């Protein structure tokens, strides 16, 4: 498990421009991530996803996020997420640790 505080910094630097995490947070360029863990791809209510995201059919968890966040366009070809990814495993683990707490129902 990663470091939550480091993960929060990574979120602010690399994710917060397009995503919110709090319950009832608005969608930006990307969807609000509240309730992310255990949800299938392309399922945040009220967000317009590509067919690629809707049809991927995986459930978000530590393992799927670890793979996705390394290279989003490789993991879901056709996603509109323009983020290049986080190459360092430790940074991805930190971000996931933060997301696990910040997006919890």
From Swiss-Prot:
Iron among keywords: yes
Which PANTHER family has this protein been placed in?
Answer: CYTOCHROME C (PTHR11961)
Question: Its function?
Answer: Electron carrier protein. The oxidized form of the cytochrome c heme group can accept an electron from the heme group of the cytochrome c1 subunit of cytochrome reductase. Cytochrome c then transfers this electron to the cytochrome oxidase complex, the final protein carrier in the mitochondrial electron-transport chain. Plays a role in apoptosis. Suppression of the anti-apoptotic members or activation of the pro-apoptotic members of the Bcl-2 family leads to altered mitochondrial membrane permeability resulting in release of cytochrome c into the cytosol. Binding of cytochrome c to Apaf-1 triggers the activation of caspase-9, which then accelerates apoptosis by activating other caspases.
Provide the family line: Belongs to the cytochrome c family.
Q: Which PROSITE patterns match?
A: CYTC
**Which organism was this protein described from?**
Mirounga leonina
How is this protein annotated for GO cellular component? cytosol; mitochondrial intermembrane space
Q: Where in the cell is it found?
A: Mitochondrion intermembrane space
Which keywords does this Swiss-Prot/TrEMBL entry list? Acetylation, Apoptosis, Electron transport, Heme, Iron, Metal-binding, Mitochondrion, Phosphoprotein, Respiratory chain, Transport
Please name the GO terms that the record assigns under molecular function: electron transfer activity; heme binding; metal ion binding
Location of Phosphotyrosine modifications = 49, 98
Q: How is it modified after translation?
A: Binds 1 heme c group covalently per subunit.
Any Pfam family: Cytochrom_C
For the ligand (heme c), the binding residues are 15, 18-19, 81
Query: Could you tell me which residues carry N6-succinyllysine?
Result: 56, 73
Q: What is this protein called?
A: Cytochrome c
Q: Which InterPro entries match?
A: Cyt_c-like_dom, Cyt_c-like_dom_sf, Cyt_c_1A/1B
Superkingdom of this entry's organism?
Eukaryota
Residues with PTM N-acetylglycine: 2
Q: Which residues carry this modification: N6-acetyllysine?
A: 73, 100
The answer to keyword Cell membrane applying to this record is no
Chief subcellular location: mitochondrion
| GO terms of biological process kind | apoptotic process
Q: Which Gene3D superfamilies match?
A: Cytochrome c-like domain
């Amino acid at each position: 498990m990663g470091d939550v505080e480091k993960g929060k910094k990574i979120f602010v630097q690399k994710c917060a421009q397009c995503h919110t995490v709090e319950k009832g947070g608005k969608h930006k360029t990307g969807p609000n991530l509240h309730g992310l863990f255990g949800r299938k791809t392309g399922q945040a209510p009220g967000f317009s996803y590509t067919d690629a995201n809707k049809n991927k059919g995986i459930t978000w968890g530590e393992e799927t996020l670890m793979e996705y966040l390394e290279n989003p366009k490789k993991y879901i070809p056709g996603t509109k997420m323009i983020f290049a990814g986080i190459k360092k495993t430790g940074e991805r683990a930190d971000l996931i640790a933060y997301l696990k707490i910040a997006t919890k129902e």
